[in-house]
Regions:
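Short, Lys/Arg-enriched N-terminal segment that forms or immediately precedes the first helix
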Residues: 23-45
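Alpha-helical linker/hinge and terminal dimerization helices associated
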Residues: 44, 54, 91, 120-131
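Basic, amphipathic "hinge/linker" alpha-helix immediately C-terminal to the N-terminal HTH DNA-binding motif
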Residues: 49, 100-121
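Canonical helix-turn-helix DNA-binding module
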Residues: 67, 71-99, 103
Length: 175
């Protein structure tokens, strides 16, 4: 397989593609539900890969915790929202707690496992900010509360701290 060109904010670069997962072999529709996915990306998508689940997680990071508030923010049908919240609780991404003021309402809050999705949400947001809006088009921007400055771009880093590009990584199977 030859080099491919990828564009980033600084221009074009040549990278050698590295096969991460054979996506044709792990399409969810093509395998039985009880068959474990061989790829961490595929397994992650099984848990949080649909639109509503990721948006629920995004809203939870933004402080939303009640069913009605999720519904107002997302505009999702009640049955779909209830299903996704249930799945996220079952997956250990969210947990339910009694509402703070002691009412009969439940709140959905991120677990430690759910909090680890913050870099995923930030990376998706930054990619969207950089690629899905026309110049001058209004959109939200993630800012550092302390400085008021935009959050620095998310970059994978090596164990020594240097930024890594796609051609500088390799997937190794662990048995």
């Amino acid at each position: 397989m030859g080099l491919i060109q990828l564009q980033n904010k600084t221009g074009w670069m040549l990278v050698e593609p590295v096969l991460k997962c054979n996506h044709n072999d792990v399409m969810k529709e093509d395998i039985r539900p009880d068959t474990p996915q061989p790829c961490p990306v595929a397994r992650s998508l099984d848990v949080i890969g649909d639109r509503w689940s990721l948006l629920i997680v995004r809203d939870a990071f933004d402080g939303i915790s009640r069913f009605g508030d999720f519904q107002r923010s997302l505009g999702a049908a009640r049955n779909i929202l209830a299903d996704r919240l249930r799945r996220l609780v079952e997956a250990g991404i969210l947990e339910t707690r009694p509402a703070a003021e002691g009412s009969a309402y439940l709140e959905y809050v991120l677990t430690a496992q759910g909090l680890e999705l913050f870099p995923v949400i930030v990376a998706l947001r930054q990619w969207g900010e950089g690629h899905l809006f026309a110049p001058g088009e209004a959109h939200s921007l993630l800012l550092d509360r302390q400085t008021g400055l935009p959050v620095a771009p998310m970059l994978p880093r090596g164990g020594d701290g240097r930024a890594l590009l796609p051609g500088q990584t390799v997937v190794q199977k662990i048995d």
